[in-house]
Regions:
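Hydrophobic, well-structured mid-protein blocks that either form specific transmembrane helices
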Residues: 123-181
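A short helix->beta-strand "capping" segment at the edge of beta-propeller domains
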Residues: 38-55, 86-90
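Conserved beta-strand positions in repeat-built beta-propeller and related beta-rich domains
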Residues: 71-75, 113-120, 153-159, 200-204, ...
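Beta-rich, blade/repeat-based domains predominating
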Residues: 55-66, 99-109, 139-150, 156, ...
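A short beta-strand motif characteristic of beta-propeller blades
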Residues: 47-52, 90-96, 132-137, 174-182, ...
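Beta-strand-rich domains and repeat architectures in extracellular enzymes and scaffolds
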Residues: 48-80, 96, 100-107, 258-260
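Short loop/turn segments that connect beta-strands within beta-propeller blades
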Residues: 85-89, 127-131, 167-170, 212-216, ...
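Blade-loop segments of beta-propeller domains
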Residues: 89-124, 133-139, 143
Length: 271
């Protein structure tokens, strides 16, 4: 075996720093520079059909189950969870959320409907069939939205982090840090699990982020600016924003709406 060569002498710049240090620093920055150069595509869509929506419903959560929509509404004294007829918009069942609780996102798990509240650090569990209250649970921070896959729940809290919850204990078991072009994506709101991805409304924008649940990266945007109602027809144009995603997996139907919007839109994403 040949003898090892001695280490090469370091070269120095005019400020006395070894050039090898610059090389190492540049190498460390390469992944970040690559992220900054990423382009996130915007995915097209077509509107398949529209359905009526209660213009008094300040939508905070939405999901589809067995032919019906389930919706949670916010604002103090007006918060509720409700079962809704998709075709007519009629409220079939409703459970009011008492003050001082401000209702937020909902999800179904087996025979339970689970609801978050905004800043009260308290959640409510209802019987899915009757919407009768069952129990309560607690969590840290704010509660914004819920969805699930077949193993766990996902919870947003207005930050760039999506919590993973055990569906039985409702305790946090992990988290996903969501990024767009390498930067944290804050204000994640309503969530929906669609074909192995997380879809998230970004609060106060017209965009939905398609998120890889493994890496946390935004892989595409869905911009629904064209669906926003005329501001003159809204109760509060500043706050009556896009919020609400529901998915009918059996028939591959995606529904979107907004707070106090007059319509729910069934959309088909472009391939």
């Amino acid at each position: 075996m040949a003898a090892a060569l001695p280490p090469a002498a370091a070269t120095w710049d005019d400020r006395g720093m070894p050039r090898t240090v610059y090389s190492l620093l540049f190498s460390a920055l390469l992944p970040s520079l690559a992220h900054c150069g990423e382009t996130i595509p915007t995915q097209g869509y077509t509107v398949v059909r529209t359905y009526p929506h209660d213009t008094a419903a300040f939508t905070e959560g939405l999901f589809y189950l067995d032919g019906h929509l389930y919706e949670s509404t916010g604002e103090l004294g007006q918060s509720s969870v409700r079962k809704v007829d998709l075709d007519t918009g009629e409220v079939l069942q409703q459970a009011n959320t008492p003050p001082p609780f401000y209702g937020e996102g909902i999800v179904a798990w087996k025979d339970r409907l689970i609801q978050l509240t905004w800043r009260n650090q308290r959640g409510f569990v209802y019987d899915l069939a009757t919407l009768a209250p069952r129990t309560q649970f607690s969590y840290s921070g704010e509660g914004w939205a819920l969805t699930s896959d077949d193993r766990q729940l996902y919870m947003s809290d207005g930050t760039a982090s999506i919590r993973r919850l055990d569906p039985q204990s409702l305790k946090q078991i992990g988290s996903i840090k969501v990024t767009a072009r390498g930067k944290p994506l804050d204000n994640l709101n309503e969530l929906e699990w669609v074909k192995g991805e997380l879809l998230a409304n970004v609060w106060l924008t017209t965009r939905i982020a398609r998120i890889d649940p493994v890496t946390g990266k935004v892989i595409a945007w869905i911009d629904l600016k064209a669906l926003v109602p005329d501001p003159d027809t809204l109760t509060d144009p500043t706050n009556d924003v896009l919020n609400g995603i529901a998915y009918d997996a059996e028939h591959d139907r995606l529904f979107v709406t907004g707070k106090r919007w007059p319509k729910i839109y069934e959309i088909k994403l472009a391939q």
